[in-house]
Amino acid sequence: MRIILLGAPGAGKGTQAQFIMDKFGIPQISTGDMLRAAIIKAGTEMGKQAKSVIDAGQLVSDEIILGLVKERIAQEDCAKGFLLDGFPRTIPQADGLKENGVSIDYVLEFDVADEVIVERMSGRRAHLPSGRTYHVTFNPSKVEGQDDVTGEPLVIREDDKPETVLARLGVYHEQTAPLIAYYTKEAEAGKTEYLKFDGTKLVAEVSAEIEKVLS
């Protein structure tokens, strides 16, 4: 079961990724984690290449990232499948997977309108010292603007400010709209299965739908 997840930041992808991993016993493969591991260990040839590029402050090429992905999915814990999150981000990367013989069984897209995502994310409030988070609509603190435990002020993290969220959504649409078209076409050709979920539904509802189609 080889799965790619597509969805804007704040669309609930991370929550459903965790559900799929727990339910089906497959690992999540994050290119960010792989690059961090390459920096620490640099155990393989690809890892060494990635480390030297990162140390030089340069962007890691698709070729190196694809090499790291191939190495990672050859490991024992990926025998039953894996979940790719945050990769591929571009058409050349999607082509690269195909050229490297990595077939994908399911592409899952989590669809949520931009204005809903902005409301979800800009409503978040954080108590930075403890890491406790709240939401003005969905999970409010007992006293507005104050942490429940300490009474200290809550803040809006930089990442959750509406202008930051909108900028991230702009990047997502620019990069991912072509991928949606790409994998829809692959599905029409019978090479993968493309499934779209309404990310505005309750988490448990979306999880139940995913379980049904993947079982």
Swiss-Prot record:
Annotated stretches, region: NMP: 30-60
Domain of life: Bacteria
Entry binding sites for ATP: G10, A11, G12, K13, G14, T15, R124, T133, Y134, K201
Entry-linked PROSITE patterns: ADENYLATE_KINASE
Pfam families: ADK, ADK_lid
Principal location: cytoplasm
EC number: 2.7.4.3
Compartmental location: Cytoplasm
Catalytic activity, reaction form: AMP + ATP = 2 ADP
Molecular function terms, GO-annotated: adenylate kinase activity; ATP binding
Tagged with keyword Nucleotide-binding: yes
SUBUNIT field: Monomer.
Family the entry assigns: Belongs to the adenylate kinase family.
Role according to the record: Catalyzes the reversible transfer of the terminal phosphate group between ATP and AMP. Plays an important role in cellular energy homeostasis and in adenine nucleotide metabolism.
Protein name, as recorded: Adenylate kinase
Organism from which the protein derives: Aliivibrio salmonicida (strain LFI1238)
